[in-house]
């Protein structure tokens, strides 16, 4: 990369406003009067209303067996008082990471709104019943895709992957419902720490953290 390119990157920044686009005031501890779940759901609804693509997308952080951090984007499919839930192949790279170190972080990045929410804590698999309930809501094509893909494993070509999809499509052609793969299911990140972030002028951002029942403001 040329020096001029780096200089351009160094100058790139967005100046956040002093109020939200909906006219609301600065994020403060009283916004969490009804708990962190209520505020997270409100911000999710705001992101959806703003037309943000996949507003429930989270950047999921894990560490591998060697202690090296890895991130990727997945979709949050449930929020409740215990934490947030996502679903995946248990044999995937993230599944292997969580088997060796069952702890993760997740960030909802709503850049267009100048907002982020960060959740971290221990991770456990959800029950088979909870997995089956979510699985039943997935489109059939997504169900077949989960059977066809040995997630995170190398494959010679896309054509080979499509051949695998065609094979499972034929296998389940006479089935009214597609069963849950044995190596597929949900994980719940128990919300040990939740932080709400709101961009503000001159990088003097608002940060409110919920931890061990305490709600506290953090310096930016």
Curated annotation (Swiss-Prot):
> Which cysteines share a disulfide bond?
none
Q: In which pathway does it act?
A: Cofactor metabolism; pyridoxal 5'-phosphate salvage; pyridoxal 5'-phosphate from pyridoxamine 5'-phosphate: step 1/1; Cofactor metabolism; pyridoxal 5'-phosphate salvage; pyridoxal 5'-phosphate from pyridoxine 5'-phosphate: step 1/1
Looking up PROSITE patterns in the UniProt record yields:
PYRIDOX_OXIDASE
Q: Where does FMN bind?
A: 72-77, 87-88, 94, 116, 151-152, 197, 207
Catalytic activity reads: pyridoxamine 5'-phosphate + O2 + H2O = pyridoxal 5'-phosphate + H2O2 + NH4(+); pyridoxine 5'-phosphate + O2 = pyridoxal 5'-phosphate + H2O2
Question: Any binding details for the cofactor?
Answer: Binds 1 FMN per subunit.
| Keyword match Oxidoreductase | yes
Name the coenzymes or cofactors required: FMN
- Where do the annotations place substrate binding? 13-16, 77, 134, 138, 142, 203-205
Which top-level group of life is the source organism from?
Bacteria
Enzyme class comes to oxidoreductase
Q: What's the EC number here?
A: 1.4.3.5
Cited Pfam families = PNP_phzG_C, PNPOx_N
Alphabetical keyword list? Flavoprotein, FMN, Oxidoreductase, Pyridoxine biosynthesis
Q: Name one molecular function that GO assigns to this entry.
A: pyridoxamine phosphate oxidase activity
One GO BP annotation is: pyridoxine biosynthetic process
Q: What does this protein do?
A: Catalyzes the oxidation of either pyridoxine 5'-phosphate (PNP) or pyridoxamine 5'-phosphate (PMP) into pyridoxal 5'-phosphate (PLP).
Its quaternary organisation is:
Homodimer.
Q: Per the similarity annotation, which family is this?
A: Belongs to the pyridoxamine 5'-phosphate oxidase family.
Q: What is this protein called?
A: Pyridoxine/pyridoxamine 5'-phosphate oxidase
Source species, please? Answer: Mycobacterium sp. (strain KMS)
